[in-house]
Curated annotation (Swiss-Prot):
GO terms for molecular function: 1-deoxy-D-xylulose-5-phosphate synthase activity; magnesium ion binding; thiamine pyrophosphate binding. Pathway: Metabolic intermediate biosynthesis; 1-deoxy-D-xylulose 5-phosphate biosynthesis; 1-deoxy-D-xylulose 5-phosphate from D-glyceraldehyde 3-phosphate and pyruvate: step 1/1. Mg(2+) binds at D151, N180. SMART domains: Transket_pyr. Its cofactor is Mg(2+); thiamine diphosphate. This is 1-deoxy-D-xylulose-5-phosphate synthase. InterPro entries: Dxylulose-5-P_synthase, THDP-binding, Transketo_C/PFOR_II, Transketolase-like_Pyr-bd, Transketolase_BS, Transketolase_C, Transketolase_CS. Binds 1 Mg(2+) ion per subunit. It comes from the Bacteria. It comes from Mesorhizobium japonicum (strain LMG 29417 / CECT 9101 / MAFF 303099). It catalyses: D-glyceraldehyde 3-phosphate + pyruvate + H(+) = 1-deoxy-D-xylulose 5-phosphate + CO2.
Amino acid sequence: MNATPHTPLLDKVRIPADLRALDESELPQLASELRLELVDAVSRTGGHLGAGLGVVELTVALHYVFNTPDDRLIWDVGHQAYPHKILTGRRDRIRTLRQEGGLSGFTRRAESEYDPFGAAHSSTSISAGLGMAAARDLSGGRNNVIAVIGDGAMSAGMAYEAMNNAGALDARLIVILNDNDMSIAPPTGAMSAYLARLASGKAYAGLRDFGKKLTSYLGKRADRAITRAVEHARGYVTGGTLFEELGFYHIGPIDGHNLEHLIPVLKNVRDNGEGPVLIHVVTQKGKGYAPAEAAADKYHGVNKFDVITGAQAKAPANAPAYTKVFAESLIREAREDDRIVAVTAAMPSGTGLDLFGEVFPSRTFDVGIAEQHAVTFAAGLATEGYKPFAAIYSTFLQRAYDQVVHDVAIQKLPVRFPIDRAGFVGADGATHCGAFDTTFLASLPGFVVMAAADEAELRHMVRTAAAYDDGPIAFRYPRGNGVGVDMPERGEVLELGKGRVVREGSKVALLSFGTRLQDCLIAAEELGAAGLSTTVADARFAKPLDEDLIRRLARSHEVLVTVEEGAIGGFASHVLQFLAHEGLLESGLKVRPLVLPDVFTDHAKPEKMYADAGLDAAGIVRTVFTALDHTARAQRA
């Protein structure tokens, strides 16, 4: 195990008030020690490393200049908030990041008063900050509100909606644009820093105020000319930008790693007290840790790693990852059908579409962090006869639900939805749990909804989706590796709305939707050993249901347990409605639905989360024993 780094100055800082007591000349050393602490902590827990390394100086500067927590500091997404956590009373728990019972990997209101708004999905910070600023103004307050948002998150429409609103309200709001990709504009050394200080200072602010006063004196007719003059002066100093057109006073770009540049600008903006203001800072993802600087994409999210070498620990896999199976299966189908195209919303590697893009670059579309646009873009492709696969994580598909309903389902457009990260996702916790997609998709008329029980089934579902042209179709699969089944070279086209029986029995029926099938098979062995002959079936489809299969299971078994990795209102609800309509609940059948708990579940290892939810083999056995009033056995299980 690596030795804990030597951090004498950081040891004096428990909360930001301690930081503000330091001399400004000490801050570079503090930043250096904070970076060492961050690398060491994440090396032991895994997590998001690169983004945090990129904002160390910015984090120090913000807490030094602003009076947090009275001044509200909002981090968009939250990947970059680990240094913030270390400086806000959570250093003693930083090595519990993303562990059961430990700190969240994102900002979280319940965790600290220094986290005024929870995050994990992108592009929400400006909207939340504007709401806080409006509330402050209604209450007569004077505190500052600062939203820190990355250039990637600025690709989402919500950020611009919020900025447009902030400009219209002339709200006193500070937005820090953290450009860690140099995708907008690089700073140009000392001149850039000088211009940023000039633009943020009182002299230029005085010019703005003079213009406003002159407008009020001369009347509205002079407003346009004066506004143009002031904007011309601003453009001469800072360069005209889209942000100015939205009503923001734009400062920068400035070097986000130079505290001598950051602190004067932040102080000027704080003291001027008018807004909205956007400060454009340029940072380097992975700054200060050579392996992360050299491969920012590989060190965005990491497993545990060796600090000296940067080598990440990875357990050997006995089966391929579901994401890779999806990608390889889609590539296989795309070789046969040049109408297949792939769409991702800024998650090419997470969804496996980076592999597809290597083979079919012209048929791969990364639309940025813009799930709403991604879905309607895919719908447009479908209208022209193409076969779009819009690969979106379950949790992120929630962001585009209106587009799924209005632009895809109502028009019966054949958009394919590969839904990765279905079910519990472990360390990323409640914000990334794939709980709701079956519930919100299977309720839509004409929508086909499937779930893969294993990696071979996933391959079949990719081909089934490619072959289906009568409307929208979705198939869900979890994070992680498959179960090690034999893999066909190419998938088969599944019969629509038909499941399969994988084990025959007579007393108990376990009907699985998704990858809990393996736990059902283990449970069936235990139940069989207890004298309870058990059938195990894989539903494959939540919509359309295999009504013949369900009818057969209901009529020939005493207990029917449905098992799924989704929330209430999903597969089991459709099964129960069918059973009720058919009168199959009136003959003594004991039905027990097993679903994800009706809570937002905190982070832990997925296997522990499923066990706690009663969705492992032991939980299934307990459910059956309880249904049969085997109280003693239920207690022993």
